[in-house]
Design a protein with these regions (language model features):
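Enzymes that bind and transform nitrogen-containing heteroaromatic metabolites
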Residues: 18-207
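N-terminal amphipathic/basic-hydrophobic helices that include classical n-h-c signal peptides
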Residues: 1-25
């Protein structure tokens, strides 16, 4: 049985750090998103099963912290912060729920006055703030959502992109990276197929 789930759910594997426009080695910033065959990234158009969630948990366990914008943070908090109402999700979602609940989170927002749920606000210049987070030691930062990754891609700060292509046609948007001002050339580094027909494709920028 498949279930819908927020698009901000993270599906990352550890990759070696790569240089970015700031030109020195830092812990890598990775982005993962679910997308339909016709390019829709609305989480309501997605579905997930136990195999995909197992992949999500394995990847989350290799993360130091999550990076969200306000909308994704609020969506994920509403979906996954305890306590869950009994019977609202299957047992195989519980490892993901526990892992994301415990994770350190950074929230980029100029409007929120405070956050909790193991979270810390990130304000000011986005490039400098994320650069500082990347300088810290660790395994990597994971970013989810749609709008924040667009800004990070513009700054050349994303070190890995993972697109989990769902075997579905949605017939509507939103789409990824709408308004991106320049091409970002990528090279495929891995491909993983799931029994559902979904395919996780991981790319690194061509530097």
């Amino acid at each position: 049985m498949s279930h819908r789930f927020p698009a901000g759910s993270i599906l990352f594997l550890v990759r070696p750090p790569y240089g970015d426009r700031y030109s020195y080695v830092m812990r890598p910033l990775r982005y993962s998103i679910n997308v339909t065959l016709d390019g829709c990234c609305d989480h309501r158009a997605m579905f997930a099963d136990e195999d995909l969630f197992r992949h999500v948990v394995e990847n989350l366990e290799q993360a130091d912290a999550l990076l969200f914008g306000r909308v994704t943070y609020e969506m994920m908090e509403a979906a996954w912060r305890p306590p869950a109402r009994p019977g609202t999700r299957p047992d195989w979602m519980e490892p993901f729920a526990r892992t994301i609940d415990a994770a350190k989170k950074y929230v980029v927002s100029s409007t929120l006055e405070r956050v909790d749920w193991n979270a810390e606000l990130v304000r000011g210049d986005l490039g400098k703030a994320v650069q500082q987070l990347k300088r810290e030691s660790g395994k990597g930062l994971l970013v989810g959502g749609v709008k924040l990754p667009l800004a990070l891609a513009e700054l050349g700060l994303i070190d890995e992109y993972e697109f989990v292509v769902q075997p579905r046609l949605a017939g509507h948007g939103p789409t990824l990276f709408a308004g991106l001002s320049k091409h970002v050339d990528l090279k495929l580094v891995s491909r993983l197929e799931f029994g559902s027909g979904a395919v996780a494709m991981r790319y690194e920028p061509r530097r």
